[in-house]
Amino acid sequence: MLSIRTNYKTIYDNILDTAGEYLEKNRGIQSLVIGLSGGIDSALTCVIASELVKQFPGMRLIGRSIPIETNTDHEIIRARKIGENFCTHFQQEDLTFAFQNLYKDLMSNSHRKHSESYEEKIRRGNVKARLRMVYLFDLAHYEKGMVLSTDNYTELLLGFWTLHGDVGNYGFLQYLWKTEVYGLSQFLVDQYRSRNEISKADALQSCIDAVPTDGLGITTSDFDQIGVTDYTMVDNILIRYLKGEEENRDHPVIVRHIRSEFKRRDPQNISREALVQDSR
């Protein structure tokens, strides 16, 4: 159990209110664009966005499943079910061919040889994430929309994302713990079931039940990369550390948090003060 208490109805209402205020102030936005992976974060973001666009007649929620090479059939099916149940417009765009050609050129230009090492898988995964964002941002520009981020607070603190590859224009979940992402998702599943919207409930439930993975072909699950067995453990370790408790400082979760600080500070820039100071 997470060591903090969460009121999921309050969080849900606050997301809709805050995001609605943002769209009200930015009336030039005509659509919301989201990449659907079949995972819980993009699924929950899509579900919330489907309710948000109802506040703005004519605004579209455009969903894309963008498999590349290593995505499983199960991931693709889950993404499709979310897209078909919640998006105004949904389709699948396989970018495997584009990725393979791009990566072949990158390898050739840098004179690298193909390998199956862990580091090589990370590099390939980074290129996949960045290629997806190239596609989504181009689509958003064409549709006069904005790309929705799907990251959560746990991923932020662990550096569990690709620089310039996973971040959109606006995020609902960035400061929710991963455990809370699951909790809010289950809250919404229960709401759909209470209204007998079974197809929507089943689509979201399938993402809750799935083994979490980045879908980039680096490992078979998030836990393999993080070094733990569940997200409740991860979140509680991080919560205690952020409160100043030091007993877990050598735990792989905290080591990863500390080592990924450069990501949370990206991009680094020389300050105005440092530029103009007289050092003579």
Per-segment meaning from a language model:
Residues 39:
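Conserved G/P- and acidic residue-centered "switch" motifs that form tight phosphate/ATP-binding loops
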Residues 1-34, 44, 48-51, 58-72, ...:
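ATP/NTP-dependent adenylation/nucleotidyl-transfer catalytic domains that generate, transfer
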